[in-house]
From Swiss-Prot:
<dbReference type="GO" id="GO:1905555">
    <property type="term" value="P:positive regulation of blood vessel branching"/>
</dbReference>
<dbReference type="GO" id="GO:0043066">
    <property type="term" value="P:negative regulation of apoptotic process"/>
</dbReference>
<feature type="modified residue" description="Phosphoserine; by GSK3-beta; alternate">
    <location>
        <position position="23"/>
    </location>
</feature>
<dbReference type="GO" id="GO:0030331">
    <property type="term" value="F:nuclear estrogen receptor binding"/>
</dbReference>
<dbReference type="GO" id="GO:0046332">
    <property type="term" value="F:SMAD binding"/>
</dbReference>
<dbReference type="GO" id="GO:0072089">
    <property type="term" value="P:stem cell proliferation"/>
</dbReference>
<feature type="modified residue" description="Phosphoserine">
    <location>
        <position position="675"/>
    </location>
</feature>
<feature type="modified residue" description="Phosphoserine; by GSK3-beta">
    <location>
        <position position="29"/>
    </location>
</feature>
<dbReference type="GO" id="GO:0005911">
    <property type="term" value="C:cell-cell junction"/>
</dbReference>
<keyword id="KW-0963">Cytoplasm</keyword>
<dbReference type="GO" id="GO:0045976">
    <property type="term" value="P:negative regulation of mitotic cell cycle, embryonic"/>
</dbReference>
<dbReference type="GO" id="GO:0045893">
    <property type="term" value="P:positive regulation of DNA-templated transcription"/>
</dbReference>
<dbReference type="GO" id="GO:0048709">
    <property type="term" value="P:oligodendrocyte differentiation"/>
</dbReference>
<dbReference type="GO" id="GO:0007155">
    <property type="term" value="P:cell adhesion"/>
</dbReference>
<feature type="modified residue" description="Phosphoserine; by CDK5">
    <location>
        <position position="246"/>
    </location>
</feature>
<dbReference type="GO" id="GO:0010718">
    <property type="term" value="P:positive regulation of epithelial to mesenchymal transition"/>
</dbReference>
<dbReference type="GO" id="GO:0035995">
    <property type="term" value="P:detection of muscle stretch"/>
</dbReference>
């Protein structure tokens, strides 16, 4: 029966795959019962095969390999010899698999493994046994380490307090080695005396190696909450802050990483670091060149500065903004750039740090990373740029940044588009060069497309409309920009934004843009066809009613609705209608909406700028005889005559022009008396020539302030939390705005006017047909 024994041994050695047996049975069209193959018995499928999970077996490959294994023939003597070898070495094979350390060196054991990809049963069983053995060994070692540390800690504590520095050094080295093992590390952190001794030794030693070992020990302890608490209670934070002045890099690394762990996870650590002067030390370390060290240091600064104004001011006083900007300009390590941008983002909402960052070149340095593959870095840079942008309207060398921002308007990321639009809005405000640059790189088309894509997302549409408003006034490319908005199909969506659900800040911005677009005669008809005029009148009436209602209730403060004063809406809508009224067809529409009584009433406004725009629109309407008669019929003569004495030359000139146009059908004697009155009023300071009055600010002045961001917001300020214009709409930078000015009386005497001797000169003194250089809707003074 030797042959049978041989085959049994070979069968044990080969360990044929169960799938091979299953496949063999299925080749004979039998169902596998599981007895021969060992396969799990399952109900036969409809196909007549066995386990459905094994239907993908390549039986031909299995049978081919099986046949290959027996391609060599053996004699009975050879089989008996092989059987004997396997029988004698079976115990060694098991021992080699499960307890390899017990074998004699050099012992040769025949393997039963024919295929290296398929381990034998013994090898498979050995894996869990090895894991169990290692677990037992680790447990024994852990217990040994813990017992050793527990016995050694009291003695080591005494040695750390020894007067002999050599002894202290040896003890510090030993404690450092113990802290590398988990069991002894826990024993150390549970001994307050030991932790205090480590802190004291680190703080007082002059030996570099002792400082390195003690700092390394605290670093190892700081990976556990229990260790962090022990360090904190032992006064470790002041000692670690002191070590930030060490000239040894390894000590610096241990100190900053330990402090970083404390700041992240230990309550009270932030205040302790601040009190120990940690901020000043950390800022001083920003001139190091190790990027990973700098990344940890800047992250510590961010943790300390976030939500703490005093920390932000300390960083400023220590020269932090310049150092942080230098990092952004110098390095390429993504994590360092990200942590540094986070610090700058926190500092950028501080009114003191903001100009310092801008002056250090922060705008340009942050702009270098707007095309980085790291989205978290790009987003932080954009947030920071947006916070800084209202303080950077006078910065030079912004061409690259502006071009990148225009490109980012096409991003699919809503946050990126929102930030890019807000930054462009601020940087184009009252900055001639920036306006030119944005127009030259396709900014008008990009902004119009952004508004079209944004739909009702006002956090995008409002800054985009503000940017368009800035770009359509007061620079050489303004007329091109006014045309470009129309050519890129922007007029319909702009007029649509005057309607619900737009909120007042967006409406205010849109009114200003329409006013600037109306400076281009080619836009008059399209704006009229889109229904801009009736909507402007509706908004004007509503805002005026709100102001009148408040006044009748005894209110003295200007009313804010969603951060916008209703007086701003009154002034803005009237100013837009003033420019639109330059077109004869628009004048007919405006007059047909019964607006003249309201415009006359606005002449009595205590706000000088509202007086000016009201007189301006009446001046345009009075070109038509019917309108001039209607203006006179509404009793406009008295307030207009009073406004002749206004300190604002623009108001006085418009009032004079309306009075003159109203007098065209009057007797010659009346005209002469009016002429003398106008001359004495308008030239009361000096006999200025009429052809010079176009520079007196007859058109509407500039408006508002930059799109700022709340200092109490760590990331960014909503456009709706106060609006982009913080001053009264239309405030002229060259004049003081007297909110409580005179109120013209309704019964101001008009008789006894002298001869009107300067009629033609008066008409020459009106604003030019294109007052593009005087456009007012350009925020941020």
């Amino acid at each position: 029966m030797a042959t049978q024994a041989d085959l049994m041994e070979l069968d044990m050695a080969m360990e044929p795959d169960r799938k091979a047996a299953v496949s063999h049975w299925q080749q004979q069209s039998y169902l596998d019962s599981g007895i021969h193959s060992g396969a799990t018995t399952t109900a036969p499928s409809l196909s007549g095969k066995g386990n459905p999970e094994e239907e993908d077996v390549d039986t031909s490959q299995v049978l081919y390999e099986w046949e290959q294994g027996f391609s060599q023939s053996f004699t009975q003597e050879q089989v008996a010899d092989i059987d004997g070898q396997y029988a004698m070495t079976r115990a060694q094979r098991v021992r080699a698999a499960m307890f390899p350390e017990t074998l004699d060196e050099g012992m040769q054991i025949p393997s039963t493994q024919f295929d290296a990809a398929h381990p034998t049963n013994v090898q498979r069983l050995a894996e869990p046994s090895q894991m169990l053995k290692h677990a037992v060994v680790n447990l024994i070692n852990y217990q040994d380490d813990a017992e050793l540390a527990t016995r050694a800690i009291p003695e080591l504590t005494k040695l750390l307090n020894d007067e002999d520095q050599v002894v202290v050094n040896k003890a510090a080295v030993m404690v450092h080695q113990l802290s590398k093992k988990e069991a002894s590390r826990h024993a150390i952190m549970r001994s307050p005396q030991m932790v205090s001794a480590i802190v004291r030794t680190m703080q007082n030693t002059n030996d570099v190696e002792t400082a390195r070992c003690t700092a390394g020990t605290l670093h190892n302890l700081s990976h556990h909450r229990e260790g962090l608490l022990a360090i904190f209670k032992s006064g470790g934070i002041p000692a670690l802050v002191k070590m930030l002045g060490s000239p040894v890099d390894s000590v610096l690394f241990y100190a900053i990483t330990t402090l970083h762990n404390l700041l992240l996870h230990q309550e009270g650590a932030k205040m302790a670091v601040r009190l120990a002067g940690g901020l000043q030390k950390m800022v001083a370390l920003l001139n190091k060149t190790n990027v990973k060290f700098l990344a940890i240091t800047t992250d510590c600064l961010q943790i300390l500065a976030y939500g703490n104004q005093e920390s932000k001011l300390i960083i400023l006083a220590s020269g932090g903004p310049q150092a942080l900007v230098n990092i952004m300009r110098t390095y390429t390590y993504e994590k360092l750039l990200w942590t540094t941008s986070r610090v700058l983002k926190v500092l950028s909402v501080c009114s003191s740090n903001k100009p310092a960052i801008v002056e250090a070149g922060g705008m340009q340095a942050l702009g270098l990373h707007l095309t980085d593959p790291s989205q978290r870095l790009v987003q932080n840079c954009l947030w920071t740029l947006r916070n800084l942008s209202d303080a950077a309207t006078k910065q030079e060398g912004m061409e690259g940044l502006l071009g990148t921002l225009v490109q980012l308007l096409g991003s699919d990321d809503i946050n990126v588009v929102t930030c890019a639009a807000g930054i462009l809005s601020n940087l184009t405000c009252n900055n001639y060069k920036n306006k030119m640059m944005v127009c030259q790189v396709g900014g008008i088309e990009a902004l119009v497309r952004t508004v079209l894509r944004a739909g009702d997302r006002e956090d995008i549409t409002e800054p985009a409309i503000c940017a368009l408003r800035h770009l359509t006034s007061r620079h050489q490319e303004a007329e091109m920009a006014q045309n470009a908005v129309r050519l890129h199909y922007g007029l319909p969506v702009v007029v649509k934004l005057l309607h619900p659900p737009s909120h007042w800040p967006l409406i205010k911005a849109t009114v200003g843009l329409i006013r600037n677009l109306a400076l281009c005669p080619a836009n008059h008809a399209p704006l009229r066809e889109q229904g801009a005029i009736p909507r402007l009148v509706q908004l004007l009436v509503r805002a005026h009613q709100d102001t009148q209602r408040r006044t009748s209730m005894g209110g003295t403060q200007q009313q804010f609705v969603e951060g916008v004063r209703m007086e701003e809406i009154v002034e803005g809508c009237t100013g837009a209608l003033h420019i639109l009224a330059r077109d004869v067809h628009n004048r007919i529409v405006i007059r047909g909406l019964n607006t003249i009584p309201l415009f006359v009433q606005l002449l009595y406004s205590p706000i000088e700028n509202i007086q000016r725009v009201a007189a301006g629109v009446l001046c345009e309407l009075a070109q038509d005889k019917e309108a001039a008669e209607a203006i006179e019929a509404e009793g406009a003569t008295a307030p207009l005559t009073e406004l002749l004495h206004s300190r604002n030359e623009g108001v006085a000139t418009y009032a004079a022009a309306v009075l003159f146009r109203m007098s065209e059908d009057k007797p010659q004697d009346y005209k002469k008396r009016l002429s003398v009155e106008l001359t004495s009023s308008l030239f009361r300071t000096e006999p200025m020539a009429w052809n010079e009055t176009a520079d007196l600010g007859l058109d509407i002045g500039a408006q508002g302030e930059p799109l700022g961001y709340r200092q109490d917001d760590p990331s960014y300020r909503s456009f709706h939390s106060g609006g982009y214009g913080q001053d009264a709409l239309g405030m002229d930078p060259m004049m003081e705005h007297e909110m409580g000015g005179h109120h013209p009386g309704a019964d101001y005497p008009v008789d006894g006017l002298p001869d009107l001797g300067h009629a033609q000169d008066l008409m020459d003194g009106l604003p030019p047909g294109d007052s593009n250089q005087l456009a007012w809707f350009d925020t941020d003074l």
